Protein backbone atom coordinates (compact mmCIF):
# COMPACT_ATOMS: atom_id res chain seq x y z
CA UNK A 1 0.00 0.00 0.00
CA UNK A 2 1.41 3.36 -1.04
CA UNK A 3 2.05 5.97 1.62
CA UNK A 4 -0.42 8.89 1.86
CA UNK A 5 0.95 12.21 0.69
CA UNK A 6 -1.63 14.31 2.51
CA UNK A 7 -1.79 14.81 6.24
CA UNK A 8 -5.35 14.51 7.51
CA UNK A 9 -4.58 16.22 10.79
CA UNK A 10 -3.22 19.30 9.03
CA UNK A 11 -6.41 19.60 6.95
CA UNK A 12 -8.52 19.42 10.09
CA UNK A 13 -6.52 22.21 11.67
CA UNK A 14 -7.01 24.41 8.63
CA UNK A 15 -10.73 23.90 8.73
CA UNK A 16 -10.78 24.80 12.40
CA UNK A 17 -8.92 28.03 11.70
CA UNK A 18 -11.40 28.96 9.06
CA UNK A 19 -14.24 28.37 11.47
CA UNK A 20 -12.56 30.54 14.10
CA UNK A 21 -12.31 33.50 11.71
CA UNK A 22 -16.08 33.34 11.13
CA UNK A 23 -16.22 35.35 7.90
CA UNK A 24 -19.73 35.76 6.59
CA UNK A 25 -20.14 37.57 3.28
CA UNK A 26 -23.80 38.12 3.81
CA UNK A 27 -23.27 39.80 7.18
CA UNK A 28 -20.45 41.87 5.72
CA UNK A 29 -22.60 42.97 2.85
CA UNK A 30 -25.39 43.87 5.26
CA UNK A 31 -23.02 45.97 7.34
CA UNK A 32 -21.78 47.75 4.21
CA UNK A 33 -25.30 48.29 3.02
CA UNK A 34 -24.92 46.06 -0.02
CA UNK A 35 -27.12 43.29 -1.17
CA UNK A 36 -26.27 39.78 -0.11
CA UNK A 37 -25.70 37.05 -2.67
CA UNK A 38 -28.50 34.61 -3.15
CA UNK A 39 -27.92 31.10 -1.94
CA UNK A 40 -28.95 28.20 -4.05
CA UNK A 41 -28.74 24.58 -3.11
CA UNK A 42 -26.91 22.30 -5.48
CA UNK A 43 -29.12 19.40 -4.79
CA UNK A 44 -31.24 18.12 -7.64
CA UNK A 45 -34.47 18.25 -5.65
CA UNK A 46 -34.11 21.97 -4.93
CA UNK A 47 -33.23 22.78 -8.54
CA UNK A 48 -36.24 20.95 -9.84
CA UNK A 49 -38.61 22.78 -7.43
CA UNK A 50 -39.18 26.45 -8.64
CA UNK A 51 -41.19 27.34 -5.52
CA UNK A 52 -38.14 26.97 -3.34
CA UNK A 53 -36.27 29.63 -5.33
CA UNK A 54 -39.18 32.06 -5.04
CA UNK A 55 -39.43 31.48 -1.32
CA UNK A 56 -35.72 32.08 -0.84
CA UNK A 57 -35.90 35.30 -2.90
CA UNK A 58 -38.74 36.63 -0.75
CA UNK A 59 -36.83 35.85 2.41
CA UNK A 60 -33.75 37.64 1.09
CA UNK A 61 -35.75 40.75 0.15
CA UNK A 62 -37.43 40.84 3.58
CA UNK A 63 -34.09 40.58 5.37
CA UNK A 64 -32.68 43.30 3.12
CA UNK A 65 -35.56 45.69 3.94
CA UNK A 66 -35.18 45.02 7.65
CA UNK A 67 -31.48 45.77 7.46
CA UNK A 68 -32.11 49.07 5.63
CA UNK A 69 -34.67 50.13 8.22
CA UNK A 70 -32.31 49.39 11.07
CA UNK A 71 -29.53 51.37 9.37
CA UNK A 72 -31.81 54.39 8.85
CA UNK A 73 -32.93 54.27 12.48
CA UNK A 74 -29.29 54.12 13.62
CA UNK A 75 -28.44 57.15 11.48
CA UNK A 76 -31.36 59.12 12.93
CA UNK A 77 -30.32 58.25 16.46
CA UNK A 78 -26.72 59.28 15.76
CA UNK A 79 -27.71 62.68 14.35
CA UNK A 80 -28.49 65.27 17.07
CA UNK A 81 -31.93 66.84 16.90
CA UNK A 82 -31.88 70.46 15.75
CA UNK A 83 -33.92 72.86 17.87
CA UNK A 84 -36.93 74.32 16.08
CA UNK A 85 -36.63 78.00 15.36
CA UNK A 86 -39.60 80.15 16.05
CA UNK A 87 -40.50 81.98 12.88
CA UNK A 88 -41.44 85.54 13.62
CA UNK A 89 -42.27 86.27 10.02
CA UNK A 90 -45.18 83.82 9.91
CA UNK A 91 -46.91 85.41 12.88
CA UNK A 92 -46.28 88.94 11.69
CA UNK A 93 -47.25 88.53 8.03
CA UNK A 94 -50.45 86.58 8.61
CA UNK A 95 -53.56 88.74 8.90
CA UNK A 96 -55.99 87.96 11.71
CA UNK A 97 -58.90 85.71 10.96
CA UNK A 98 -62.10 87.65 10.37
CA UNK A 99 -64.27 85.18 12.26
CA UNK A 100 -62.13 85.33 15.45
CA UNK A 101 -62.31 88.16 17.91
CA UNK A 102 -58.98 89.91 18.22
CA UNK A 103 -57.36 89.46 21.59
CA UNK A 104 -54.75 91.89 22.87
CA UNK A 105 -51.86 89.60 21.89
CA UNK A 106 -53.25 88.91 18.42
CA UNK A 107 -53.89 92.60 17.84
CA UNK A 108 -50.27 93.49 18.53
CA UNK A 109 -49.08 90.69 16.26
CA UNK A 110 -51.37 91.79 13.42
CA UNK A 111 -50.35 95.44 13.34
CA UNK A 112 -47.33 94.71 11.13
CA UNK A 113 -49.49 92.68 8.76
CA UNK A 114 -52.07 95.45 8.61
CA UNK A 115 -49.33 97.92 7.64
CA UNK A 116 -48.24 95.61 4.82
CA UNK A 117 -51.78 95.09 3.51
CA UNK A 118 -53.34 97.05 0.65
CA UNK A 119 -56.94 97.85 -0.29
CA UNK A 120 -58.30 97.97 -3.85
CA UNK A 121 -61.52 99.85 -4.68
CA UNK A 122 -63.91 98.60 -7.38
CA UNK A 123 -66.10 101.45 -8.62
CA UNK A 124 -68.33 99.05 -10.57
CA UNK A 125 -69.24 95.44 -9.92
CA UNK A 126 -70.39 93.39 -12.93
CA UNK A 127 -74.12 92.61 -12.72
CA UNK A 128 -75.06 89.79 -10.35
CA UNK A 129 -71.42 88.96 -9.50
CA UNK A 130 -71.09 87.50 -6.01
CA UNK A 131 -68.14 87.93 -3.60
CA UNK A 132 -67.09 84.29 -4.06
CA UNK A 133 -66.82 84.77 -7.83
CA UNK A 134 -64.85 87.99 -7.38
CA UNK A 135 -62.47 86.24 -5.01
CA UNK A 136 -61.94 83.38 -7.46
CA UNK A 137 -61.11 85.87 -10.24
CA UNK A 138 -58.63 87.94 -8.19
CA UNK A 139 -57.10 85.16 -6.07
CA UNK A 140 -54.48 84.14 -8.71
CA UNK A 141 -52.90 87.62 -8.51
CA UNK A 142 -52.39 87.69 -4.74
CA UNK A 143 -53.60 86.50 -1.37
CA UNK A 144 -56.96 88.10 -0.50
CA UNK A 145 -58.05 88.55 3.10
CA UNK A 146 -61.42 90.32 3.11
CA UNK A 147 -63.99 91.50 0.57
CA UNK A 148 -66.88 93.90 1.04
CA UNK A 149 -69.49 94.64 -1.64
CA UNK A 150 -72.17 97.32 -1.25
CA UNK A 151 -75.61 95.96 -2.22
CA UNK A 152 -77.95 97.77 -4.56
CA UNK A 153 -80.92 99.82 -3.41
CA UNK A 154 -83.79 97.54 -2.30
CA UNK A 155 -86.31 99.80 -4.05
CA UNK A 156 -84.56 99.37 -7.44
CA UNK A 157 -84.37 95.60 -6.88
CA UNK A 158 -88.09 95.49 -6.09
CA UNK A 159 -88.89 97.54 -9.21
CA UNK A 160 -86.78 95.20 -11.37
CA UNK A 161 -88.48 92.12 -9.95
CA UNK A 162 -91.95 93.65 -10.42
CA UNK A 163 -91.06 94.45 -14.03
CA UNK A 164 -90.16 90.80 -14.62
CA UNK A 165 -86.38 91.19 -14.40
CA UNK A 166 -83.72 89.06 -12.73
CA UNK A 167 -84.38 88.26 -9.09
CA UNK A 168 -80.67 87.92 -8.19
CA UNK A 169 -79.03 90.46 -5.94
CA UNK A 170 -76.63 92.93 -7.55
CA UNK A 171 -73.84 95.06 -6.06
CA UNK A 172 -72.79 98.60 -6.90
CA UNK A 173 -69.23 98.95 -5.53
CA UNK A 174 -66.72 96.99 -3.50
CA UNK A 175 -63.41 96.86 -1.61
CA UNK A 176 -60.85 94.04 -1.66
CA UNK A 177 -58.06 93.70 0.91
CA UNK A 178 -54.80 92.07 -0.21
CA UNK A 179 -52.22 90.86 2.30
CA UNK A 180 -49.43 92.64 0.40
CA UNK A 181 -49.34 96.14 -1.07
CA UNK A 182 -47.32 95.08 -4.09
CA UNK A 183 -49.97 92.53 -5.04
CA UNK A 184 -52.70 95.16 -4.82
CA UNK A 185 -50.70 97.63 -6.94
CA UNK A 186 -49.82 94.94 -9.48
CA UNK A 187 -53.47 93.90 -9.81
CA UNK A 188 -54.54 97.50 -10.48
CA UNK A 189 -51.77 98.06 -13.03
CA UNK A 190 -52.45 94.78 -14.79
CA UNK A 191 -56.24 94.50 -14.84
CA UNK A 192 -57.61 98.06 -14.75
CA UNK A 193 -59.71 98.96 -17.83
CA UNK A 194 -59.28 95.46 -19.27
CA UNK A 195 -61.80 92.73 -19.95
CA UNK A 196 -62.33 90.06 -17.34
CA UNK A 197 -61.77 87.37 -19.94
CA UNK A 198 -61.89 83.68 -19.24
CA UNK A 199 -63.88 81.32 -21.40
CA UNK A 200 -65.49 82.98 -24.39
CA UNK A 201 -68.98 81.84 -23.44
CA UNK A 202 -68.69 82.90 -19.79
CA UNK A 203 -71.11 85.45 -18.35
CA UNK A 204 -68.45 88.03 -17.42
CA UNK A 205 -66.12 87.62 -20.42
CA UNK A 206 -66.73 91.08 -21.94
CA UNK A 207 -67.06 93.09 -18.69
CA UNK A 208 -64.30 95.54 -17.79
CA UNK A 209 -62.36 95.80 -14.55
CA UNK A 210 -62.54 99.13 -12.71
CA UNK A 211 -59.80 98.92 -10.09
CA UNK A 212 -58.14 101.66 -8.05
CA UNK A 213 -55.44 101.22 -5.42
CA UNK A 214 -56.21 103.31 -2.33
CA UNK A 215 -52.89 104.64 -1.09
CA UNK A 216 -52.66 104.82 2.69
CA UNK A 217 -56.15 103.36 3.04
CA UNK A 218 -56.63 100.44 5.42
CA UNK A 219 -59.54 98.17 6.20
CA UNK A 220 -60.28 99.86 9.52
CA UNK A 221 -60.75 103.13 7.62
CA UNK A 222 -63.43 101.43 5.57
CA UNK A 223 -65.17 100.09 8.66
CA UNK A 224 -64.96 103.53 10.27
CA UNK A 225 -66.38 105.11 7.13
CA UNK A 226 -69.22 102.58 7.00
CA UNK A 227 -69.88 103.10 10.71
CA UNK A 228 -69.90 106.88 10.19
CA UNK A 229 -72.28 106.53 7.23
CA UNK A 230 -74.55 104.26 9.25
CA UNK A 231 -74.46 106.70 12.17
CA UNK A 232 -75.23 109.59 9.82
CA UNK A 233 -78.06 107.63 8.24
CA UNK A 234 -79.49 106.71 11.63
CA UNK A 235 -79.17 110.30 12.89
CA UNK A 236 -80.86 111.58 9.72
CA UNK A 237 -83.60 109.02 10.19
CA UNK A 238 -84.01 110.03 13.82
CA UNK A 239 -84.19 113.69 12.78
CA UNK A 240 -86.82 112.89 10.15
CA UNK A 241 -88.80 110.80 12.62
CA UNK A 242 -88.65 113.55 15.25
CA UNK A 243 -89.65 116.12 12.62
CA UNK A 244 -92.57 113.99 11.44
CA UNK A 245 -93.69 113.34 15.03
CA UNK A 246 -93.45 117.06 15.76
CA UNK A 247 -95.50 117.85 12.66
CA UNK A 248 -98.05 115.21 13.61
CA UNK A 249 -98.32 116.59 17.13
CA UNK A 250 -98.67 120.12 15.74
CA UNK A 251 -101.35 118.93 13.32
CA UNK A 252 -103.25 117.16 16.11
CA UNK A 253 -102.90 120.25 18.31
CA UNK A 254 -104.24 122.47 15.51
CA UNK A 255 -107.14 120.09 14.89
CA UNK A 256 -108.01 120.07 18.57
CA UNK A 257 -107.68 123.85 18.70
CA UNK A 258 -109.93 124.20 15.64
CA UNK A 259 -112.49 121.93 17.26
CA UNK A 260 -112.28 123.98 20.42
CA UNK A 261 -112.69 127.25 18.50
CA UNK A 262 -115.62 125.81 16.55
CA UNK A 263 -117.25 124.74 19.79
CA UNK A 264 -116.66 128.16 21.29
CA UNK A 265 -118.16 129.82 18.19
CA UNK A 266 -121.19 127.53 18.32
CA UNK A 267 -121.63 128.27 22.00
CA UNK A 268 -121.27 132.02 21.37
CA UNK A 269 -123.87 131.90 18.59
CA UNK A 270 -126.22 129.92 20.78
CA UNK A 271 -125.69 132.37 23.61
CA UNK A 272 -126.22 135.33 21.29
CA UNK A 273 -129.34 133.77 19.84
CA UNK A 274 -130.60 133.10 23.31
CA UNK A 275 -129.86 136.69 24.30
CA UNK A 276 -131.64 138.02 21.19
CA UNK A 277 -134.71 135.91 21.85
CA UNK A 278 -134.69 137.12 25.46
CA UNK A 279 -134.51 140.80 24.39
CA UNK A 280 -137.29 140.31 21.83
CA UNK A 281 -139.50 138.81 24.51
CA UNK A 282 -138.82 141.78 26.78
CA UNK A 283 -139.66 144.25 23.96
CA UNK A 284 -142.92 142.45 23.24
CA UNK A 285 -143.84 142.72 26.86
CA UNK A 286 -142.98 146.44 26.86
CA UNK A 287 -145.01 146.99 23.65
CA UNK A 288 -147.90 145.23 25.20
CA UNK A 289 -147.71 147.34 28.33
CA UNK A 290 -147.45 150.81 26.57
CA UNK A 291 -150.67 152.15 24.97
CA UNK A 292 -150.12 153.79 21.67
CA UNK A 293 -151.83 157.22 20.98
CA UNK A 294 -152.09 158.60 17.44
CA UNK A 295 -152.82 162.28 16.59
CA UNK A 296 -155.78 162.21 14.28
CA UNK A 297 -156.71 164.82 11.65
CA UNK A 298 -160.09 166.43 12.40
CA UNK A 299 -162.86 165.35 10.05
CA UNK A 300 -164.43 167.87 7.65
CA UNK A 301 -167.89 169.00 8.58
CA UNK A 302 -170.75 168.00 6.32
CA UNK A 303 -172.48 170.86 4.49
CA UNK A 304 -176.04 171.65 5.37
CA UNK A 305 -178.63 171.97 2.61
CA UNK A 306 -179.75 175.41 3.77
CA UNK A 307 -176.41 177.03 3.49
CA UNK A 308 -175.85 179.40 0.44
CA UNK A 309 -173.01 178.91 -1.92
CA UNK A 310 -170.57 181.68 -2.53
CA UNK A 311 -171.28 184.03 -5.43
CA UNK A 312 -168.26 182.96 -7.43
CA UNK A 313 -169.19 179.30 -7.24
CA UNK A 314 -172.64 179.98 -8.43
CA UNK A 315 -171.40 182.14 -11.30
CA UNK A 316 -168.96 179.38 -12.47
CA UNK A 317 -171.53 176.71 -12.21
CA UNK A 318 -173.99 178.82 -14.20
CA UNK A 319 -171.51 179.19 -17.01
CA UNK A 320 -170.85 175.48 -17.18
CA UNK A 321 -174.36 174.26 -17.06
Curated annotation (Swiss-Prot):
All copies of domain RRM, residue ranges: 118-208
Keyword RNA-binding tagged: yes
Coiled coil: none
PANTHER family reported in the protein's UniProt record: ACTIVATOR OF BASAL TRANSCRIPTION 1 (PTHR12311:SF7)
Location of this chain's protein in the cell: Nucleus, Nucleolus
GO cellular component terms listed in the entry, alphabetical order: nucleolus
InterPro entries, A to Z: ABT1/Esf2, ABT1/ESF2_RRM, Nucleotide-bd_a/b_plait_sf, RBD_domain_sf, RRM_dom
Lineage, uppermost ranks: Eukaryota, Fungi, Dikarya, Ascomycota, Pezizomycotina
Family annotation (Pfam families): RRM_1
Protein name per UniProt: Pre-rRNA-processing protein ESF2
Alphabetical keyword list: Nucleus, Ribosome biogenesis, RNA-binding, rRNA processing
Any one GO biological process: small-subunit processome assembly
Job of this protein: Involved in the small subunit (SSU) processome assembly and function, and in the 18S rRNA synthesis. Required for the early cleavages at sites A0, A1 and A2.
Listed PROSITE patterns: RRM (PS50102)
Similarity comment: Belongs to the ESF2/ABP1 family.
Biased composition (Basic and acidic residues): 64-82, 276-288
Gene3D superfamilies named in the record: 3.30.70.330
Organism: Gibberella zeae (strain ATCC MYA-4620 / CBS 123657 / FGSC 9075 / NRRL 31084 / PH-1)
Source domain of life: Eukaryota
Biased composition (Acidic residues): 11-29, 44-63
Gene name, Swiss-Prot/TrEMBL: ESF2
Cystine residue pairs: none
A GO molecular-function descriptor: RNA binding
Cross-referenced SUPFAM superfamilies: RNA-binding domain, RBD
Region of interest called Disordered, as start-end residue ranges on this chain: 1-98, 266-291
